[in-house]
């Protein structure tokens, strides 16, 4: 909480069993508090929640870390989802060729229908090699008010790919990837994303991969390097394109486009793997790189 007064927050909770009791949290003024979600819903395996601030201005971050004893199984910050929609796109999902030594052990889509009616859902894969609907994911019935997780099958053999979710009722969706990347156990969360409206993304001299999903025949953006040197990059797109971001790039400037364009950034290093969707509401004011090292977390005051 960055306010001079205390903040009061309602946390609405759901699990695989349906609606759970709402928790009310009080955050002292100008302070940071950490809560374990396992204490909110003990014994639940699939969760979704919605935060409502009754009073005060707060910043919220969610971190998922898996370990058993002294063995770490990875960790990742989870980006917030946009409002529920009948058309959802999840970009920047790691594929089997993300790094040279990639072995994906499981990849699942987590779905939640917040309304009162069940939803019929179709999932399409989008990659640089094309768009297709995998067998078994073309007509899923998801019960309302319950969190559901479905295994992804027949995955594209690309470095990165995206998912398009078409639903009869508004939904939210995320993808959880688990596997070995460069001989390191990792988990990666990929959240849905809204189309860009012309944002600027600042980078900390670290290479990565930019995922671009659009129906436009090509997309252009401006790259800023050392001493403010600018250059324009134009990429042809067949549903999706991937651009390798050099570590010399300080900034990428996007323009609003007639066709909806969706962006995500993926980074790999000796510390691990991380991806993040680029949300317009966040990137106009603050842009943060994915956190690669789950053992280091320094809260920043604003």
Regions found by a protein language model. Give the residues of each.
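Short acidic, flexible loop segments centered on an aromatic residue
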Residues: 2-20, 52, 103-133, 166, ...
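Short, aromatic- and glycine-rich surface loops/edge beta-strands on solvent-exposed regions
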Residues: 45-55, 160-169, 249-267
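Transmembrane beta-barrel architecture of outer membranes
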Residues: 22, 32-36, 46, 72-75, ...
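A cross-kingdom feature marking solvent-exposed beta-strand/loop segments within repeated
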Residues: 8, 14-50, 127-162, 227-251, ...
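Short, tandemly repeated low-complexity microdomains enriched for cysteine and small residues
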Residues: 9-13, 20-27, 60-66, 71-73, ...
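Short tyrosine-centred short linear motifs in exposed loops/low-complexity segments
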Residues: 6, 43-46, 117, 158-159, ...
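Long, internal scaffold/assembly segments composed of regular secondary structure
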Residues: 81-151, 164
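Conserved functional hotspot residues at active sites or interaction interfaces
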Residues: 2-3, 56-115, 171-217, 236-239, ...
């Amino acid at each position: 909480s960055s306010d001079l007064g205390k903040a009061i927050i309602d946390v609405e909770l759901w699990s695989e069993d349906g609606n759970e009791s709402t928790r009310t949290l009080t955050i002292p003024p100008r302070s940071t508090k950490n809560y374990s979600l396992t204490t909110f819903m003990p014994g639940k395996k699939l969760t979704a929640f919605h935060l409502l601030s009754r009073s005060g201005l707060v910043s919220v971050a969610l971190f998922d870390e898996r370990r058993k004893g002294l063995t770490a199984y990875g960790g990742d910050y989870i980006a917030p989802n946009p409002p529920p929609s009948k058309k959802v796109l999840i970009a920047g999902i790691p594929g089997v060729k993300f790094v040279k030594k990639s072995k994906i052990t499981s990849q699942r889509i987590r779905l939640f229908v917040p309304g009162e009616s069940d939803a019929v859902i179709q999932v399409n894969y989008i990659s640089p090699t094309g768009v297709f609907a995998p067998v078994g994911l073309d007509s899923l019935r998801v019960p309302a008010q319950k969190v559901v997780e479905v295994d992804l099958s027949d995955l594209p053999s690309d470095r990165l790919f995206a998912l398009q979710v078409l639903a009869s009722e508004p939904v939210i969706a995320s993808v959880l990837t688990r596997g070995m990347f460069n001989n390191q156990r990792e988990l990666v969360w990929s959240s849905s994303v809204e189309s860009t409206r012309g944002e600027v993304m600042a980078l900390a001299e670290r290479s990565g991969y930019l995922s671009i999903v659009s129906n436009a025949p090509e997309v252009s953006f401006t790259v800023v390097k050392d001493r403010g040197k600018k250059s324009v990059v134009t990429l042809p797109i067949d549903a999706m394109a991937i651009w390798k971001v050099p570590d010399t790039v300080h900034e990428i400037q996007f323009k609003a486009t007639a066709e909806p364009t969706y962006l995500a950034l993926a980074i790999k290093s000796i510390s691990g793997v991380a991806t993040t969707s680029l949300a317009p509401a966040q990137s106009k004011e603050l842009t943060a790189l994915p956190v690669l090292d789950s053992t280091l977390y320094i809260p920043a005051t604003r």
